[in-house]
Amino acid sequence: MNTEEIINLIANSKKKNPLKVYLKGNLKEVDFSNVEFYGNDEFGILFCEEEDFKTIYETYKDSIINYRIERDRKNSAIPLADLSKYNARIEPGAIIRDLVEIGDGCVIMMGAVINIGACIKENTMIDMNVVIGGRAQIGKNCHIGAGAVIAGVIEPPSAQPVVIENNVLIGANAVVLEGVKVGQGSIIGAGSVVISDVEPYSVVAGVPAKFIKKVDDKTKAKTQLVEGLRKLK
């Protein structure tokens, strides 16, 4: 999806306020036919929109002794992704929005956040607490180190997305700014801030990131990926 399509989708989507509600009372008197309800005549769990619960409560408040609400979003425009569609290892606590592409054999670690429109190709690892912004493009066999930020480009709409080509290693807590292209086989040092394009097979580091050297055999040996971490069975 391009930026305008994503903006239109967010702007025109019906905003959602889903609730999980624990109910106690004389519930046999309550009509749950228009919502998702699990329980019995005295206790139950309700999954519904906020407005639906308000209607139920106002109508049947004399029958409801007590309730507790769990809410994890407010006026949400885009749902989280259905993780069952991915052939990847996705650990608990990763947050992945809908309309994200994740290739076979990828690893998404705890705390990673991946925004709408991002594309991650096969066998790439997104380490703990990484932020992948909207429309970011990440190639095959990459490692995005813990705490790194790959900037998104939903706003402003004119910005070009980050493109990270195949076999790139990005060190922990590095930041890659909007519109930057990181060439194939490159290495970004930990804590670097990348503000301009990186030529293929380059090592860059610093704030802002500067060219250090070309990737050599010694560097490759120190930064090789472990295939076993990407096995799904």
Curated annotation (Swiss-Prot):
Gene3D superfamilies: Hexapeptide repeat proteins, Malonyl-CoA ACP transacylase, ACP-binding. One of its GO terms (molecular function) is tetrahydrodipicolinate N-acetyltransferase activity. It comes from the Bacteria. One of its GO terms (biological process) is lysine biosynthetic process via diaminopimelate. InterPro entries: DapH, DapH_N, Hexapep, Hexapep_transf_CS, Trans_hexapeptide_repeat, Trimer_LpxA-like_sf. Belongs to the transferase hexapeptide repeat family. DapH subfamily. This is 2,3,4,5-tetrahydropyridine-2,6-dicarboxylate N-acetyltransferase. The gene is dapH.
